[in-house]
Amino acid sequence: MARIAGINVPDHKHAVIALTAIFGIGKTRSQIICAASGIAESTKLKDLDETQIEALRTEVATFTVEGDLRREVSMNIKRLMDLGCYRGLRHRRSLPVRGQRSKTNARTRKGPRKAIKK
């Protein structure tokens, strides 16, 4: 298994699909990375030599991925909560943030039903 951006990327998959194992890299961004490093998308990672894997590492390093991206997202949510804006309040109360109805749905966000005490 090749190690890119601190993640063991599966080497039995095609390069485009294998790069999506890294948090912050989807299919489109992995296609951009493969094109910039001169690697065919259909090539499997186990068939690449060390210089090509190093080229992938340098291309991935230009993006914000994994721990840095997770930290950035959580800091953005924390900032909204500290501001006290509507979105921050919805995050704080564990309710849907983007305008979905919450009277009957939103069970995933709200968690399991709480029993009503009589």
Swiss-Prot record:
GO biological process, one term: translation
Positions of transmembrane segments: none
Gene Ontology cellular component annotations, sorted alphabetically: cytosol; small ribosomal subunit
The family this protein is said to belong to: Belongs to the universal ribosomal protein uS13 family.
InterPro entries cross-referenced by the UniProt entry: Rbsml_uS13_C, Ribosomal_uS13, Ribosomal_uS13-like_H2TH, Ribosomal_uS13_bac-type, Ribosomal_uS13_CS
Gene: rpsM1
Species in which this protein is naturally found: Psychromonas ingrahamii (strain DSM 17664 / CCUG 51855 / 37)
MF-aspect GO terms: rRNA binding; structural constituent of ribosome; tRNA binding
Function: Located at the top of the head of the 30S subunit, it contacts several helices of the 16S rRNA. In the 70S ribosome it contacts the 23S rRNA (bridge B1a) and protein L5 of the 50S subunit (bridge B1b), connecting the 2 subunits; these bridges are implicated in subunit movement. Contacts the tRNAs in the A and P-sites.
Chain spans, region Disordered: 94-118
PROSITE patterns named in the record: RIBOSOMAL_S13_1 (PS00646), RIBOSOMAL_S13_2 (PS50159)
This protein's UniProt keywords: Ribonucleoprotein, Ribosomal protein, RNA-binding, rRNA-binding, tRNA-binding
Keyword presence, DNA damage: no
Protein name: Small ribosomal subunit protein uS13
Disulphides: none
Subunit composition and interactions: Part of the 30S ribosomal subunit. Forms a loose heterodimer with protein S19. Forms two bridges to the 50S subunit in the 70S ribosome.
UniProt-listed Pfam families: Ribosomal_S13
